[in-house]
Swiss-Prot record:
Family of this protein: Belongs to the ATPase alpha/beta chains family.
Cited function: Produces ATP from ADP in the presence of a proton gradient across the membrane. The catalytic sites are hosted primarily by the beta subunits.
GO cellular component annotations of the record: chloroplast thylakoid membrane; mitochondrion; proton-transporting ATP synthase complex
Originating species: Solanum tuberosum
E.C. no: 7.1.2.2
Cell location: Plastid, Chloroplast thylakoid membrane
GO molecular function, one term: ATP binding
Self-association and partners: F-type ATPases have 2 components, CF(1) - the catalytic core - and CF(0) - the membrane proton channel. CF(1) has five subunits: alpha(3), beta(3), gamma(1), delta(1), epsilon(1). CF(0) has four main subunits: a(1), b(1), b'(1) and c(9-12).
InterPro entries per the UniProt record, alphabetical: AAA+_ATPase, ATP-synt_VA_C, ATP_synth_F1_bsu, ATPase_a/bsu_AS, ATPase_alpha/beta_chains, ATPase_F1/V1/A1_a/bsu_N, ATPase_F1/V1/A1_a/bsu_N_sf, ATPase_F1/V1/A1_a/bsu_nucl-bd
Protein's UniProt name: ATP synthase subunit beta, chloroplastic
Domain of life, source organism: Eukaryota
Residues bound to ATP: G172, G173, A174, G175, V176, G177, K178, T179
CDD domains given in the database record: ATP-synt_F1_beta_C (cd18110), ATP-synt_F1_beta_N (cd18115), F1-ATPase_beta_CD (cd01133)
Record keywords: ATP synthesis, ATP-binding, CF(1), Chloroplast, Hydrogen ion transport, Ion transport, Membrane, Nucleotide-binding, Plastid, Thylakoid, Translocase, Transport
Amino acid sequence: MRINPTTSGSGVSTLEKKNPGRVVQIIGPVLDVAFPPGKMPNIYNALVVQGRDSVGQPINVACEVQQLLGNNRVRAVAMSATDGLTRGMAVIDTGAPIRVPVGGATLGRIFNVLGEPVDNLGPVDTSTTSPIHRSAPAFIQLDTKLSIFETGIKVVDLLAPYRRGGKIGLFGGAGVGKTVLIMELINNIAKAHGGVSVFGGVGERTREGNDLYMEMKESGVINKENIAESKVALVYGQMNEPPGARMRVGLTALTMAEYFRDVNEQDVLLFIDNIFRFVQAGSEVSALLGRMPSAVGYQPTLSTEMGSLQERITSTKDGSITSIQAVYVPADDLTDPAPATTFAHLDATTVLSRGLAAKGIYPAVDPLDSTSTMLQPRIVGEEHYETAQRVKQTLQRYKELQDIIAILGLDELSEEDRLLVARARKIERFLSQPFFVAEVFTGSPGKYVGLAETIRGFQLILSGELDGLPEQAFYLVGTIDEATAKAMNLEMESNLKK
C-alpha cells in the first residue's frame, strides 16, 4: 500500500487562516469550539488555538476534533497542556488530520505526538509528511509468507518464536522486565539484522525514555557522530502528557513505520511501550467526552480503537512491520478487558512471570504461558518443534510435582521423577541469559545465541548427557558450551576451597 506523502511542514505548523473559530468552553484537556455556519471541520481534523496567556506569552495548542455537537460547535481534545487558554481565543481549522515527518530524516531523532523534534538537535531535514489517520492496507496487498524472526534470546526463539511481520505481545505486571526486554530486542535486531526500528513510548516514565535514548547512543543504535546512520526513530508521549497525546502517539509512530514499509520497501520493527497506556488514554478521553463506560470502566469503543491501530500493523508485498508491544497487565489479571482485547490481535505472546523474576531468572519469560502460532512442525521444522515440546513437557511435569516436593521433599519422589526434576531445574536456569543492555547492572557481558545453538543446548540437557553438571552452571550463560566451561570452573573453585 503506497502512502501519498505531501511536502508540507510537519505537525500543524502550516496554517491557512481560511476557517477561523472561537473557544467557547474549556474542561481540562477538552475544548468546545464554535465555527461559522456551514464551515464545520471534519472528525480528526487538527485545530490550532492561538493567542496569548495572562503574562503575554504566545499560545499555540494543537487539538483534534472528536465530536460534532450541533449548533455549529465541535468538541476537540488537546494534544498538549491547556494552561493559559481562555474562552474567546481564536482557533484555526487546518483542514486535515495531524501530519508528521516521515522517511530517513526521522532516524536518530525524538519526536512528540505532533511530529515536532524534542531532542534540541534542530529541525528535521525533510519536507515529506503523512497524516496519522489512514486506512489499513487492502486484503489483496497483504503478504502471507510464514518465516521466523530470530531474536538471539533462547527462551523466545525456542518456545514462542516471533513471526516476521507479526504482532507480539509482552505481557507482565509492573517491574518484571518488559522494557529491558524491548531494549534488548532493539539492540539485537539492529546489530544482527541491520533493521530499522521505530519506538513508540506511549504513556510510560520519562526517565525510562531518557534511559533508552542514552543506552541507544552508547550501543551505537543511534549514531552520535552521524545521526543519519542511526537505526531507530523515537516517538514519545509520556505519563505527564494529556490523554489526547498519549492516545495518538502510537499512531504517530506507526505512520513513520508505514513509510519505511510502503515507500522505502523495508522490513521495519515497531515497538510500542506500552499498549495498555494507549487503551488507558482512550478510556480517559472517552470519559471526558461523556461516553457511557463499558466493562470495568473502559471505553465502549475499546475493540474499535484497538482494531484501527493493530490492523495497520501488517506485512504487505512491499515490506513488513513486525510489532513488539509491551502490555501492562493490571493487577496481573489477564482477563482484564485491555490485555484480553490485545490478545485477539497477536501472533505470539511473551508472558513475563513475577515468580521467575523473584527467583532471579532473567529474562523472566514464563515458558509455559508464552505461546506462538509459529511453533508448528511445518513452519519451524520437526527438530525444533520436538525439542520445544519436550522442554515444555519437562517443565510442566516439574510444576505438577512442586506441591509434592513442598510437602514431602525430593526424597519421596521416584528415581525417574527425581531425574526429571534435576533436568527441569537445569532447563529453567538455562532459559536465563545475560543481556547486552543489562551489562551495567549484572557485570556479565551480553550474549546473542543463534537458534541452531539454542536447540542443540536443550537437546543435550534432555538427553541426559549433562546430568552430572551442577544446576548453577546453567544460570545466566549463553550457549551450552559456556555452561560446561562454567561447571569446570565451579569444580576447580570447590577443589581449591577443600
